[in-house]
A protein has these predicted regions:
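Nucleic acid-binding interface residues in structured DNA/RNA-binding domains
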Residues: 2-74
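Catalytic-site beta-strand/loop segments enriched in glycine and acidic/polar residues
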Residues: 6, 10-13, 149-183, 187-189
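Glycine-rich nucleotide phosphate-binding loop and flanking beta-alpha elements
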Residues: 108, 171-172, 198
């Protein structure tokens, strides 16, 4: 499930009476989340909204805010909570020999997704790709609704994998449903979230090779540090945190585990039209 963010925004803008203006915040709240303010501002720069730019003023006095809206972002949050309730946080797979990595690159409104599968020696043996037009911008906490359709299409294209590492968070998310969890539950695959930036939480006391990531008094992930830089690992679905950490450490050669590093590289090459299996530096 996702929404066409731009269609929803257009419906709101068309409700503004002649002679009235609104604010970006009121539009974001009508969409269902004030954190969408930046996405609203970016959307208004698009050519399709040129007609509406004079209708929005952040400093407007007595702005119009009596919108009729289903608040679609609230529906997406409810879906995240439902998906989160279905997460399995123990190892529900037989082996972890074929490890997949998934990532997405963008050019404008087009997503270039790649799923690559590595063997036990961390050599890429198969990849699948998907090119999908997106109609949902980046909004903090809602990344899956932008990226999951393309990622899931790419993942469905590979013949076999045991565990999938996704470039995005799993349970280390405000609603315990980052991209890795979203994809894992929807495809019923063992998934691990791998991210270069923290979304929630604080670091706890270091353990054996990793540091717990704590959010709301719960360990939601782990921080692995290499050369002073951290990578954030979390359960996506059907994997325990301990196993997620072990697999991340086993495949870590640079900052990112190899499956994600390969996926990131190949997604960029797909976007540029030059994808191929050649050894990364």
């Amino acid at each position: 499930m996702t929404i066409n963010f731009y269609d929803e925004l257009r419906r709101l803008l068309e409700q503004i009476p002649p002679g009235r203006v609104t604010t970006p915040r009121l539009l974001a709240e009508a969409l269902g989340d004030s954190r969408a303010v930046r996405a609203v501002l970016e959307a208004l720069k698009r050519e399709e909204f040129q007609w509406a730019r004079g209708l929005v003023d952040a400093g407007a006095e007595n702005p119009y805010g009596d919108f009729e809206s289903s608040k679609p972002l609230e529906s997406l949050r409810r879906l995240q909570m439902e998906l989160s309730s279905r997460v399995v946080e123990f190892d529900d797979f037989e082996r972890a020999e074929l490890i997949g990595g998934a990532d997405v690159a963008y050019r404008g409104d087009v997503a270039y997704a790649v799923c690559v599968v590595l063997d036990a020696d961390l050599r890429p043996i198969e990849s699948s790709e998907a090119v999908v037009e997106v109609s949902f911008p980046y909004i903090p906490g809602y990344l899956a609704f932008r990226e999951a359709p393309a990622v899931e299409e790419a993942v469905r294209g590979v013949s076999a994998l045991d565990v999938l590492m996704v470039n995005g968070h799993g349970l280390a998310h405000p609603r315990r449903c980052g991209l890795a969890t979203h994809v894992g539950v929807e495809l019923n695959l063992p998934t691990i979230g791998i991210a270069a930036r923290r979304l929630v939480g604080r670091e706890g006391e270091p353990r054996d090779g990793w540091t717990p990531l704590i959010h709301r008094d719960r360990v939601v992930g782990a921080v692995l540090k290499r050369n002073g830089r951290g990578v954030y690992v979390s359960v996506g679905h059907r994997v325990s945190l301990q196993t997620a950490v072990e697999l991340a450490l086993r495949t870590l050669r640079d900052r990112l585990p190899e499956p994600v590093r390969w996926a990131h590289r190949l997604a960029g090459e797909l976007k540029r039209g030059s994808k191929g299996f050649y050894a990364p530096p």
